[in-house]
Amino acid sequence: MSGGGGGGGSAPSRFADYFVICGLDTETGLEPDELSALCQYIQASKARDGASPFISSTTEGENFEQTPLRRTFKSKVLARYPENVDWNPFDQDAVGMLCMPKGLAFKTQADPREPQFHAFIITREDGSRTFGFALTFYEEVTSKQICSAMQTLYHMHNAEYDVLHAPLADGGDQSGMEDGEGIPGTKLQRFNSYDISRDTLYVSKCICLITPMSFMKACRSVLQQLHQAVTSPQPPPLPLESYIYNVLYEVPLPPPGRSLKFSGVYGPIICQRPSTNELPLFDFPVKEVFELLGVENVFQLFTCALLEFQILLYSQHYQRLMTVAETITALMFPFQWQHVYVPILPASLLHFLDAPVPYLMGLHSNGLDDRSKLELPQEANLCFVDVDNHFIELPEDLPQFPNKLEFVQEVSEILMAFGVPPEGNLHCSESASKLKRIRASELVSDKRNGNIAGSPLHSYELLKENETIARLQALVKRTGVSLEKLEVREDPSSNKDFKVQCDEEELRIYQLNIQIREVFANRFTQMFADYEVFVIQPSQDKESWFTNREQMQNFDKASFLSDQPEPYLPFLSRFLETQMFASFIDNKIMCHDDDDKDPVLRVFDSRVDKIRLLNVRTPTLRTSMYQKCTTVDEAEKAIELRLAKIDHTAVHPHLLDMKIGQGKYEPGFFPKLQSDVLCTGPASNKWTKRNAPAQWRRKDRQKQHTEHLRLDNDQREKYIQEARNMGSTIRQPKLSNLSPSVIAQTNWKFVEGLLKECRNKTKRMLVEKMGREAVELGHGEVNITGVEENTLIASLCDLLERIWSHGLQVKQGKSALWSHLLHYQENRQRKLTSGSLSTSGILLDSERRKSDASAVMSPLRISLIQDMRHIQNIGEIKTDVGKARAWVRLSMEKKLLSRHLKQLLSDHELTKKLYKRYAFLRCDDEKEQFLYHLLSFNAVDYFCFTNVFTTILIPYHILIVPSKKLGGSMFTANPWICISGELGETQILQIPRNVLEMTFECQNLGKLTTVQIGHDNSGLYAKWLVECVMVRNEVTGHTYKFPCGRWLGKGMDDGSLERVLVGELLTSLPEVDERPCRTPPLQQSPSVIRRLVTISPNNKPKLNTGQIQESIGEAVNGIVKHFHKPEKERGSLTLLLCGECGLVSALEQAFQHGFKSPRLFKNVFIWDFLEKAQTYYETLEQNDVVPEENWHTRARNFCRFVTAVNNTPRNIGKDGKFQMLVCLGARDHLLHHWIALLADCPITAHMYEDVALIKDHTLVNSLIRVLQTLQEFNITLDTSLVKGIDI
């Protein structure tokens, strides 16, 4: 609606604010359109960069490649009535541009001159809206000067054309034929020609209504009847001023829930406005959108809009652009599009397509150029919709809307019931080239794609052949809906108890509109039925909340997503990050009571309350079952009641107090109206005082009163928009003068907006990653989920693409970032070839050390080009956009994103060549701040490349570090190694003897978890003391250290020939290219201190019972926490079981406590004790001396597991066997049984001191209770831990 509350109480009472006439000003003559200056500027800059400019006159700004009849000329607002109203100031520039977006058009008697209607919206910078409705028709040009000027232009055009195309006969350059599509010159001159002696010249003129609300059908009817009065042979009953005066001053704006009838020139006009508890006013035909695009394309476009992609609609018809844009935004209820919204983009604002912000714009097509001729600045995040050719291009990685199949089916059933083919004209990108060869006129009756002209009945007969429709019909029949001829002549849902006062076709449009909208609204009501539970109300006052809004979390996204079904997550996780969702939640926080609520929010909340009441559901109880819409009948009935019983009939048009004889009627010409009677309304508002209370019911006075008191809400909205700008510094293009300074200022706002968005996005990602935000708000420890992380990274990639697309000289490829990288790579290779660049920075160190026992791995060189090559070698990535995103992910994982981009932008000559002066990447200060913000990502660890590209081949580099003092060079056995990760494990890799460093390639293993290392015990000296093993991912640079510090050899330590080592990721130092990987380990859990060399359990420092209890409690607590996290957040369970502070180590300390010291230098291990206990219980079983059945089962299980571990073919040693037994006991929930069994075993008395923990019944019972907490969890063991055992 129109914004502001200024202008007094009459502001909301009028149906229309202005009547406007636009057209040719015969006094100023023919002027080139406003685009000419801008075109010259753009084309001149392209010419400097080697692009081919169009040929234009430097003096006139005219394009001689186009015939004068095809050119557009400046239109002007010729008249407006009244001059101004306080509550809706007249915006002459905007109205002029949008009434005639391409300026004036000329035609001759040979051209079709049908009148064209279109609606438009003027969105102010504060987000408020005014609606316009324009009817464009053609009038004969009576001015001799204009006709002579057109004739002169044709002479100039023909002369210029002959000069330009003279070389064509000699086979010269043919670039000038672009507009003529290869037509010979003489033929082209006859086409669209004008001869003053034999042709009649016509020029476009536009009549327009500017209104506070979008009553499209009523305004169209008003304008069409006015035009009919002008073109009719007979004059209208009254002067035109009477009808225009009536609609401006005597037709009121219906209040919510009311209907209105008023008179046009030839017939009554009816409009109705939904009540405050219904869906908001929407007066465009949804049917047309589904017929033009088809259900599938509408859903894809709808999803793109919800995720705030850039959307560009493309059509020859302005009204189609408007209908599609308004329909898509209306279907979003209760969410509202928050970004640039220009459904009809005036030709003079084409530079706005360069905007690096989300937008929804409509671009007019001339009907001749196809998609390939459109040079769009950025396409990586663009949804392009060719409305006339029923074709849509989607951004990559578009997630599917939740329950899409059932949703599509429900919508299709409604469409079929109204005779609308649900399968529209669906085409995928592969058929784009074919589409370009099909003329739009041929598509009108193309039976193959479902775009059927004619009545619904004929459409139905033709669609019977269609397989998809047949399947949908079968689905509908199963639901009990009759499809006999689709009831095209009579609507089964119409109510026979009353007669509506509009024609049947109009009623069916109302019914289809409300049914489709109710179904879409129901989806959001079901999906967000519990949203209020997750809104975090601010604890501070409003002023503080506004000030710190960007640092606050106002919706518990992690908890909300954890409640959602898995298939919903890809869409919902991205949707929760959008501006429209943020604004929706802001509105919720600002509205403390129902009276204060935003009207849209009030309607949505009432529906949510109704659903909860009907389903008797609690906030935590949700279902993923698809629930159909049940509110259609009620909504339909409300509309039908308003149309059957009109609440008010406006005053009929009447003779005005005006001079007789002025405005002489002349068929075919819109008369000059008498401004003295149209510029002022009634002197005293008697009509309002007399009729308003009687006709509009009493409660509507309350409604008007609340509208006066809404200043507070306007202020609230202003605060919200300021607080949640999120980088969209400029929300709407100002439709005003287009001087270079204005364009420069607009671009500067874009630059500032991009920088702000970058700052907000990096901060959001860091806060989520570190989990600080939720902790500060008192929600405990919250980690980001994999889905959320992917969403935020995808959002960062979108931002980078928009930054790299801003101010491009010439678009090359769909990804501006990847295009820039390729240019940089090409430049570097050229310099390398010429020898002007050193190769040392990009070569990997391939040295192969044999016997150096240092724990230092040769550094991995930093190289932007090498990282590009890694991406280029991945065959699974086919597109430039995909490659750019993969490169960003890899750079983030390597903590090199800021550094790489700084290196990329350091080639200033390349940047100047690729970008215009105003581009973000050429604003030095902002660019530096941008790179600084990206540098903050180095503070956290991302695995966004490793976890996404799971099937690619990765080279891994291994370094084995033996003890410096013992057993290095004399080792004679043949070693082997096997590496395991979260995504898989390698086969056993044989290591050449005396080789300590090697590289191999295998499918991505993910984060590495364990290394199994061993040897075949061959040769004279088969004893090996290994300090640690290091493994590096050669693509991501992640280096893992697997400490060992134990012997591998018979008769040494516990006699093990192989060991399972649990690893940790080493963090990298800031200058990774200058320092080796001698780095501290990443902290895996609180108070973890890793020793460089692990020592055998017998020699570990002894802990007291309190410390042992604490370590077991912490180990078990770590496992419990692991399982309480969402599955995608969980770390390595292997580390929690077998790591330094894992369960195995803690239980090892418990069994070591009070263990009797061995004599005569003989080592005794815990496994020796367990074997003796097994022998004891087996003997008892043989003698049938078992106390009870329970005890018998536990003893038998214990013996079975110990025997199975002892019989494993692996040479894992006694400590390895103990580790395996503990892991198996944890998996099968038997540990607490075994502890109780061993505590009562007589063997314990022989092998343990009296002070031992295992002999203290109180401590044992406490230990059993702790271990029992693991019973509820399903523990899955890494295959490396239980390899070779089948139990």
Curated annotation (Swiss-Prot):
GO molecular function annotations of the record: guanyl-nucleotide exchange factor activity; small GTPase binding
Residue ranges annotated for the RUN domain, each copy included: 787-950, 1134-1280
Compartmental location: Golgi apparatus membrane
Main location as per UniProt: Golgi
Mutagenesis / variant outcome for changing residue 763 to E: Abolishes the interaction with RAP6A and localization to Golgi membrane
Record keywords, A-Z: Golgi apparatus, Guanine-nucleotide releasing factor, Membrane, Phosphoprotein, Repeat
Modification Phosphoserine, positions: 193, 1085, 1087, 1096
CDD domains: PLAT_RAB6IP1 (cd01757), RUN1_DENND5A (cd17690), RUN2_DENND5A (cd17692)
Recorded consequence of changing residue 935 to A: Abolishes the interaction with RAP6A and localization to Golgi membrane
uDENN domain boundaries: 57-259
Residue ranges annotated for the cDENN domain, each copy included: 278-414
GO terms for cellular component: cytosol; Golgi apparatus; Golgi membrane; retromer complex; trans-Golgi network
Record SUPFAM superfamilies: Lipase/lipooxygenase domain (PLAT/LH2 domain), RUN domain-like
PROSITE patterns referenced in this protein's UniProt entry, alphabetically: DENN, PLAT, RUN
Phosphothreonine modified-residue sites: 1079
Ranges of residues in domain dDENN: 416-598
Alphabetical GO biological process terms: negative regulation of neuron projection development; retrograde transport, endosome to Golgi
Domain PLAT: 954-1062
Subunit and interaction comment: Interacts with RAB6A bound to GTP.
Annotated function: Guanine nucleotide exchange factor (GEF) which may activate RAB6A and RAB39A and/or RAB39B. Promotes the exchange of GDP to GTP, converting inactive GDP-bound Rab proteins into their active GTP-bound form. Involved in the negative regulation of neurite outgrowth.
Protein family per UniProt: Belongs to the RAB6IP1 family.
Entry protein name: DENN domain-containing protein 5A
Species, as recorded: Mus musculus
Gene name of this polypeptide: Dennd5a
